[in-house]
Amino acid sequence: MNTRVLRLTTTRPPAIERRVVQTSMLSLVLLVAAWCSISIGAAKSDLLFPIKLIGEWIASGQNQSSIMMIVSEIRLPRVILAILIGAALAVSGASLQGVCRNPLADPGLLGISSGAAVGAVTVIIFANSLSVPQFIQPYLIPIAAFVGAAITTFTIYRLAQVNGTVQIATLLLAGVAINAMGGAIIGAFSYVADDQSLRLMTFWMMGSLASATWFMVAISAPVLILGMYFIHKKRTEINLLLLGEANARYVGVDVDRVKHHLLWLNAIVVGVAVACSGIIGFIGLVVPHILRVST
């Protein structure tokens, strides 16, 4: 009996080539979005602003016109910080989905963002009664948000430990409980806040990059970049955790140590991101799924 083997050919490029093409396209989209964000605004809209800005820097070494000051001192820090925070939240969401083996896991689900919000709202409510040095006051809310995220992560981690092992189900339940508790605390603060504090609370919790400065970029960029780098170094362990903790241990992964490191790396990254921009949801949940579908 003769059997025929049909070989199906496809024009689909190899995986590496396809990934290069997709990365190039996404980078181009990011570049176009950043270019438009720098060029378009309430003061004046001109798609040639970045070119003019570079030309003026080269010619005089400083920004002469007011519109150039707006571009270089307001729009550019916001764009850079938006890119860093978006990337950090996406990387954090992808790693938490791997650690928890839950496609719906994100920093908000585990209560990290809620803890940061409680810290920031606490400072907003009691700002008038706090005596702090003048130079720290502009950064008091970001510092409180980061501390709140760190305390929340420590609490969730301790609650999730059973006999020295972090249980994923307990971790998720503790995160949901802390998230609900944080919402209740914020609601109570909203009830006792005056009009000015209530407006500031609402504005901060909506998420905004209006307070972005070069100083904030200089402080947050190294932390976010290093945090994303160390999370990316754990990509092999995260992929193995997706197969199950037993299988990961079978191939030599120290599961408890990896989960410990990833939880604290995510706490640092998300804490800094939320401290700079307020609560920005949806990115950490959806972006990893979009990239998985596209690749």
Give, region by region, the residue ranges found by the protein language model.
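Alpha-helical transmembrane segments in inner-membrane proteins
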Residues: 2-295
